[in-house]
């Protein structure tokens, strides 16, 4: 069965192409900084938005027209697998990601859910035998069903905690069976609405215990995946415990989990936390905890997670700058956790959206690499902090001074002189590099 009959395999045609089903900048074989674009840009398709999302919102029903939606139940799940691998092949993407309930419906009991999952996982595994597309990561959905109303690993109900543990155990087994390179934890319901009825310490300790059990079980079954935490400050919960990268680092280090986890950073979640995307990437990178990326963008005029496809070239450039500085994402990738707009309801809009996102990150890669080759920002930063390369500054940087010595030095100073930060000049230079992308 085929679902995208009027779309051929998407090819690179160059910046002057007017073909809406062609890449203008993403050339998977093009060499950038010693690697192909495909090696740098480990693109992934989000199963939930692409094959499950129906376009509904709090004010209206679904609008998406999907040829596989003529089916229901397990027949629908199987049709989505067929549609997914056709889409992967035509877009030539190396990875995909899913939550357990994306690929198979929940049953009346946990055992029924396992049975459904086993059947669909077997089907996915069979398709993967003849496909180049691999599983970047999988995860357990522990936020949609009413059982998660008060959380999963942070629920005040121990029965729910046990159910969540069972879901993750099954998820780890599925990840191993399908060769997932990572496993993600996103705590959409792990947080609180009010402190008036919350034992925060118990909830955080229980969450840490949960993660330790997951680490132990992955080792027990030989599942060598990178564990990832995906920060988000709010939505659906008022205050989520994985608020941002800084909060996540504090939690992981406090509970002795930092050796086992890195971060899966989503652009729109950074926006909701009051940060830029590059801020979260940078902070994770300098702590050696940048693991993977959910590639999307938010709307700064709106206060919720809009999950738009990434087309902001400034953002993709600065994101790829951080990723290149990180020497890539290792086992991670660029997962399009993004959905077409509610008014973009035709199935072929899925191709337009992903092509736009892939081209945007290809541009970001080329511009970021040129910035690095020309040491545009490195020279600016080195010059700005040059006072720490000699004299008293070098002693500070080398932990070779104390308050007494610094006081004596300060007393000997005359008027302190500053250098301009030159933000406007730097931004103008970035504009130049973006506008010259076709030269690189």
Curated annotation (Swiss-Prot):
Binding site for Mg(2+) 1: 230, 266, 294, 337
Superkingdom field: Bacteria
Localization of this protein: Cytoplasm
InterPro entries the record matches: Xyl_isomerase-like_sf, Xylose_isom_bac, Xylose_isomerase
Cofactor-binding details, from the entry: Binds 2 magnesium ions per subunit.
Residues that hold Mg(2+) 2 according to the record: 266, 269, 305, 307
GO MF terms held by the record: magnesium ion binding; xylose isomerase activity
Catalytic activity: alpha-D-xylose = alpha-D-xylulofuranose
E.C. numbers: 5.3.1.5
Annotated GO CC locations: cytoplasm
PROSITE patterns in the cross-refs: XYLOSE_ISOMERASE (PS51415)
Record keywords: Carbohydrate metabolism, Cytoplasm, Isomerase, Magnesium, Metal-binding, Xylose metabolism
Enzyme class: isomerase
GO annotation terms (biological process): D-xylose metabolic process
Active site: 99, 102
Family according to the record: Belongs to the xylose isomerase family.
Record's subunit section: Homotetramer.
NCBIfam families, per database record: PRK05474.1, xylose_isom_A
Protein name: Xylose isomerase
Species of provenance: Halalkalibacterium halodurans (strain ATCC BAA-125 / DSM 18197 / FERM 7344 / JCM 9153 / C-125) (Bacillus halodurans)
Lineage, broadest ranks: Bacteria, Bacillati, Bacillota, Bacilli, Bacillales
The gene coding this protein: xylA
């Amino acid at each position: 069965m085929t679902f995208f009959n009027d779309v051929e395999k998407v090819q690179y045609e160059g910046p002057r192409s007017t073909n809406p089903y062609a890449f203008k900048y993403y050339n998977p074989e093009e060499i950038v900084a010693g690697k192909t674009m495909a090696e740098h840009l480990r693109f992934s398709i989000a199963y939930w938005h692409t094959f499950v999302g129906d376009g509904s919102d709090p004010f209206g029903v679904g609008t998406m027209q999907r040829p596989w939606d003529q089916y229901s139940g397990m027949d629908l799940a199987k049709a989505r697998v067929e549609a997914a691998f056709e889409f992967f092949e035509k877009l030539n993407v190396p990875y995909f990601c899913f939550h357990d309930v994306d690929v198979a419906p929940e049953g009346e009991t946990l055992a029924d859910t396992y049975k459904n999952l086993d059947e669909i996982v077997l089907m996915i595994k069979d398709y993967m035998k003849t496909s180049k597309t691999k599983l970047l990561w999988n995860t357990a959905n522990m936020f949609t069903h009413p059982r998660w109303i008060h959380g999963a690993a942070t629920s005040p109900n121990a029965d729910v905690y046990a159910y969540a543990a069972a879901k993750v155990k099954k998820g780890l087994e599925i990840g191993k069976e399908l060769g997932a390179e990572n496993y993600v934890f996103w705590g959409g319901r792990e947080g609180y609405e009010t402190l008036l009825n919350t034992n925060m310490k118990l909830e955080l300790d229980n969450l840490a215990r949960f993660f330790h059990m997951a680490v132990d079980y992955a080792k027990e079954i030989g599942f060598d995946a990178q564990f990832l935490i995906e920060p988000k400050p709010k939505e659906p919960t008022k205050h989520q415990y994985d608020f941002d990268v800084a909060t996540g680092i504090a939690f992981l280090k406090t509970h002795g989990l930092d050796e086992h986890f890195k971060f899966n950073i989503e652009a729109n979640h950074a926006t909701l936390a009051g940060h830029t995307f590059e801020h979260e990437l940078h902070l994770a990178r300098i702590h050696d905890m940048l693991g993977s990326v959910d590639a999307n963008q938010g709307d700064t005029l709106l206060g919720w997670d809009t999950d738009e496809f990434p087309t902001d070239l400034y953002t993709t450039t600065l994101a790829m700058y951080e990723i290149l500085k990180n020497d890539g994402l290792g086992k991670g990738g660029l997962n399009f956790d993004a959905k077409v707009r509610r008014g973009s309801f035709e199935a072929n809009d899925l191709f337009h959206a992903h092509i736009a996102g892939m081209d945007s990150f290809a541009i970001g890669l080329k511009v970021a690499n040129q910035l690095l080759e020309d040491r545009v920002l490195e020279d600016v930063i080195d010059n700005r902090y040059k006072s720490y390369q000699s004299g008293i500054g070098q002693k500070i940087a080398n932990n070779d001074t104390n308050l007494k010595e610094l006081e004596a030095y300060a007393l000997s100073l005359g008027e302190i002189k500053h250098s301009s930060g030159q933000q406007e000049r730097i931004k103008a230079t970035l504009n130049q590099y973006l506008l010259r992308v076709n030269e690189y």
